[in-house]
């Protein structure tokens, strides 16, 4: 018997990332090749015409798994009964805009969306925030949604998978190993240049990649800055931000969360439970394994002095961001 369709809400549906994302969701890449979907597309009133154009293209693909679509500028409609919500739309940073202004502008958006999810989404809705600053935007949505007592805090996540995939690619290039052979990468912290991609545990066909590379200076001076500033490098080269790679990471994040990571470590920005000394509730990148729609933090990893230093720097940035929006959540 065929499965009942799953409602997937996508915000910023007319944007660059949305355009790279929607066709892959409709083709079954995210939830499986046997899972029909209904797309519930949210964007601003002035973007509705563009969303209609994207819907026309989706129709023209004749995807067997696309069971329906709606477009709306009302979050309450977009999130109604959604089992998966991809919060892609966010206010981009404009010229001369301070980071704190960006936080304030986005806090308004994610307060509204958190409330709509809290009231109208499926009680087990899995939420991924892609729009930056994604950890703090996810924190805002989570905090607001908790007021309604329906969707649990653990279901609100931020996207660290793009950093994870970027780091894998750099490690494959440096070690000369195939990217698919690399296991046990960790990305700690905030999705920002402070993130800490930690390859001390990475194995390739049983070999330690840290030993293969054996270059502490490369780690500190080349690898971490390259991964941390990759987004800026892409804007510099392309004139536009990374959209296809961000969409790809979102697909990876949800697919592994819903369908399981088969024992492999993946990175998700999740509300901390206090593990590794990270204060509870902060949305922080952790290594997790996923099974039956649940994630579990990989425990017992040794944290050396350099790692603790880097983990603290990225934590402090998150605490500062949280401080910057706390009045808006009062």
From Swiss-Prot:
Reactions catalysed, as given in the entry? (S)-malate + NAD(+) = oxaloacetate + NADH + H(+)
GO terms for MF:
L-malate dehydrogenase (NAD+) activity
Keywords recorded for this protein, A-Z: NAD, Oxidoreductase, Tricarboxylic acid cycle
Superkingdom: Bacteria
- Top EC group: oxidoreductase
Residues that, per the record, bind NAD(+): 12-18, 106, 113, 130-132
The GO biological-process annotations, alphabetized, read as: malate metabolic process; tricarboxylic acid cycle
SUPFAM superfamilies per the UniProt record, alphabetical:
LDH C-terminal domain-like, NAD(P)-binding Rossmann-fold domains
Record's Gene3D superfamilies?
Lactate dehydrogenase/glycoside hydrolase, family 4, C-terminal, NAD(P)-binding Rossmann-like Domain
Please name the catalytic residues of this protein: 191 (proton acceptor)
Question: What Enzyme Commission number(s) does the record list for this chain?
Answer: 1.1.1.37
Please name the InterPro entries in this protein's record.
L-lactate/malate_DH, Lactate/malate_DH_C, Lactate/malate_DH_N, Lactate_DH/Glyco_Ohase_4_C, Malate_DH_type2, NAD(P)-bd_dom_sf
Q: Which residues bind substrate?
A: 93, 99, 132, 166
The record's NCBIfam families line, in alphabetical order, gives: MalateDH-SF1 (TIGR01759), PRK05442.1 (NF003916)
Q: Which family does it belong to?
A: Belongs to the LDH/MDH superfamily. MDH type 2 family.
List, alphabetically, the HAMAP family matched. Answer: Malate_dehydrog_2 (MF_01517)
**Protein purpose:** Catalyzes the reversible oxidation of malate to oxaloacetate.
Which protein is depicted?
Answer: Malate dehydrogenase
Name the species this protein comes from.
Answer: Azoarcus sp. (strain BH72)
